[in-house]
C-alpha cells in the first residue's frame, strides 16, 4: 500500500526527466500504472469486508476502502487526459504546478480512505479541501470562482468544528480513536444525540445533504474539468465513506435521528430532481443530479442495515464514474461551443453523431438502466428503504421518474434539425474518446464480475 503512495509521489520527478513535448504523455502513462501497482502490492479478499489489513498504526485497508482507493488511482490519468487541452498552452511551470496539485490531492484522498484512526481521518479529510480550493481559485475561468471557493470553505469548515469537538470527547472518554476498536464498542453511555450530530455534521455537508448543498453547484461550475471530476468522483464519496465507517460503530446508532435524516434526504432527492428540470446551465444540472443521487445514498446508509450500506457503497462507485463522465462530456461541449447553456447546445449532436452515442451511454448509466451497476445500486437502495418503511416508496418512485425525465430531455434537446446559425464543430479527438471509454471500462468490468463490490457487506 505504501509502495503505491511512494510510487504516486515519484511520478513528479519522473515526468520532469522527459522533454517538454512528452510531458503529458509521460505523466499520463505513468499514472496508468498506479491502479495496477495497487492490485499487485495489495492482496485483496472479497470475502472479508471488515477484516482490516494493517500496514502500521495509522493506515490500513479492507474491502470498504480498497475499491475507493482504486477509484482514486483510476481517476488520476483520466483527469490528466481531460485537462491536457486546457493546460497545454500554459507555461511549463504552471503545468508542473497543476499536476503536482493533482497528485497531492489524490494522495490526500487515498490516505483519507486508508486511515485507521478517526483523528487522522479528520486531519486528512480537511486537508483535501486545500488542493481543490487552489484549483478553483487559480484555474477557474470566471470571477465568480472567488464566491464559489468561499462557499466551499465556509460550509466545510463550519461543519468540521462539531466533528473535531466530538472526536476530542470520544478520545477523552474512550482513550482511543482506533477504528477497529471503536467498531467493537457497544456501551450505551455514549448514546447522545449531540454526539451523533457532531460526528455526522461534516460528513453530511461534504456529501452533501439537501440544505447544505449550495456550495456544490457553485464549485462545479467554477472549477476546471479536473476539479469537477474530482468533486464528483471522489470528494462527495468522502462523506459517504465516513458515514459508513461511523454507522458500523454500535455506540453511534441513533434510530430517531436516522428517521429525521432519512426524511430530509428523500425530500432533498425529490426537490433537487425538480430543480434539475429547470436548469439552464449544463454543469449545474449535472451537479444538482449528484445532490439527488447522494440523497438516496445518505438515506440508504441511515437505515443502519448492511443491505442499505451495500447499496450506498455500490452507488458511490457507480455514481463516481458516471457523473465524472458527464462532467467531461459537458466540458468537451463547452470547449467546442464556448457555452454551457442548454438551449444554445440544441442540435449540436447532429454534427457529432459518435459524441451523441457517448451521451446516450453515459446518460443511460446515470439514470440506472439495467444491467448497469447504477441499476444494481438503486434496486438495492430501494429494497433496503422499502424494508425499513414502505412509506419511502412514493419518494423513491417520484425521484426515479423525474430523474428519467430530465436525463432524457437533456439528451433529446441536442437532437433535431440543424439551425442556419449553427457553426461547424470539430469532432471529438482520440484523447476524448479514450477518456470516455476509460470511464465506462470499470463499469463493464464490474458488470462482468459484480462480486467485486456487491458482496462486501453481505
Swiss-Prot record:
InterPro entries: NADH4_N (IPR000260), NADH_UbQ_OxRdtase (IPR003918), ND/Mrp_TM (IPR001750). GO terms for molecular function: NADH dehydrogenase (ubiquinone) activity; ubiquinone binding. It catalyses: a ubiquinone + NADH + 5 H(+)(in) = a ubiquinol + NAD(+) + 4 H(+)(out). The lineage of its organism: Eukaryota, Metazoa, Chordata, Craniata, Vertebrata. PANTHER family: NADH-UBIQUINONE OXIDOREDUCTASE CHAIN 4. Keywords: Electron transport, Membrane, Mitochondrion, NAD, Respiratory chain, Translocase, Transmembrane, Transmembrane helix, Transport, Ubiquinone. It comes from the Eukaryota. It is found in: Mitochondrion membrane. It comes from Myxine glutinosa (Atlantic hagfish). GO terms for biological process: ATP synthesis coupled electron transport; electron transport coupled proton transport. Core subunit of the mitochondrial membrane respiratory chain NADH dehydrogenase (Complex I) that is believed to belong to the minimal assembly required for catalysis. Complex I functions in the transfer of electrons from NADH to the respiratory chain. The immediate electron acceptor for the enzyme is believed to be ubiquinone. It is a multi-pass membrane protein. One of its GO terms (cellular component) is mitochondrial membrane. This is NADH-ubiquinone oxidoreductase chain 4. Belongs to the complex I subunit 4 family. Its EC number is 7.1.1.2. The chain crosses the membrane at residues 22-42, 63-83, 96-116, 117-137, 150-170, 194-214, 224-244, 257-277, 284-306, 311-333, 350-370, 391-413, 434-454.
